[in-house]
UniProtKB/Swiss-Prot annotation:
InterPro entries: MobA-like_NTP_Trfase (IPR025877), Molybde_CF_guanTrfase (IPR013482), Nucleotide-diphossugar_trans (IPR029044). It catalyses: Mo-molybdopterin + GTP + H(+) = Mo-molybdopterin guanine dinucleotide + diphosphate. PANTHER family: MOLYBDENUM COFACTOR GUANYLYLTRANSFERASE. It comes from the Bacteria. It is found in: Cytoplasm. Keywords: Cytoplasm, GTP-binding, Magnesium, Metal-binding, Molybdenum cofactor biosynthesis, Nucleotide-binding, Transferase. The keyword Magnesium applies. It comes from Rhodopirellula baltica (strain DSM 10527 / NCIMB 13988 / SH1). The lineage of its organism: Bacteria, Pseudomonadati, Planctomycetota, Planctomycetia, Pirellulales. This is Probable molybdenum cofactor guanylyltransferase.
Length: 211
């Protein structure tokens, strides 16, 4: 009798929550960066949400500083939002709140991107996801090339690191960059041109910088 092997179905990859970080004050820009027009159409907000949807489908949320901030960035009612539990504690607070939400709702981790990176691509995010699936208990971060620099707000954080991120929030420096440089993580190289962030009108060029 010939034994036949039955192929077992592949296990579904653990679910990721896509988190758009849009809680900054945009003080140097003078207007919410989420509302800036994107070169490919729409706004920085709509472009960033569409980019995340192509990776995480509808499993996305927007991290904001407060309920009042939701109206300021004109977030559509259909898009869920998370709010910082304490004000003015920087992006580490948004990361911590998102990880707590992900853990409570059955997600394995969060894919974070800021709203002010207009040139980041879907392929860049997929490269992070691919690296994370190889080692889903590790933090995966974008590593800017030329010059090299870690980008702690572009990456995947597993819910297992929730407590360590909360300790960053409670620390004196509250710096993800400082903490992650000395912690265990893996990196994915992404060209610096695609990690260009926009902080002032001059970063946008004409006609926004009045030159």
């Amino acid at each position: 009798m010939r034994n036949e092997l039955t192929a077992m179905p592949h296990a579904a990859p653990p679910p990721l929550l896509g988190v758009l970080l849009a809680g900054g004050r945009s003080s140097r820009m003078g207007t919410p960066k989420a509302l800036l027009p994107h070169p490919s159409g729409g706004t920085f907000l709509t472009h960033s949400l569409d980019r995340l949807r192509l990776v995480c489908e509808e499993k996305i949320v927007v991290s904001l500083a407060s309920e009042a901030h939701r109206a300021q960035v004109q977030l559509p009612p259909s898009v869920p939002a998370l709010f910082d539990s304490q004000p003015a504690l920087g992006p580490a607070m948004g990361v911590s709140v998102a990880l707590q939400h992900a853990s409570s709702n059955g997600f394995a981790g969060c894919l974070f991107t800021p709203v002010d990176l207009p040139d980041l691509s879907v392929d860049d995010l997929l490269s992070l996801v691919h690296a994370w699936r190889e080692s889903p208990t590790q933090i995966v971060l974008a590593q800017q090339t030329d010059p090299e620099r870690l980008q702690p707000l572009v990456g995947i954080y597993p819910v297992a690191c929730m407590d360590s991120i909360q300790r960053v929030v409670e620390s004196e420096h509250r710096s993800l960059y400082r903490s992650l440089r000395s912690s265990d993580h893996q990196t994915v190289a992404i060209p610096s041109t695609r990690l260009r962030n926009v902080n002032t009108p001059a970063d946008l060029g004409p006609p926004f910088d009045s030159t």
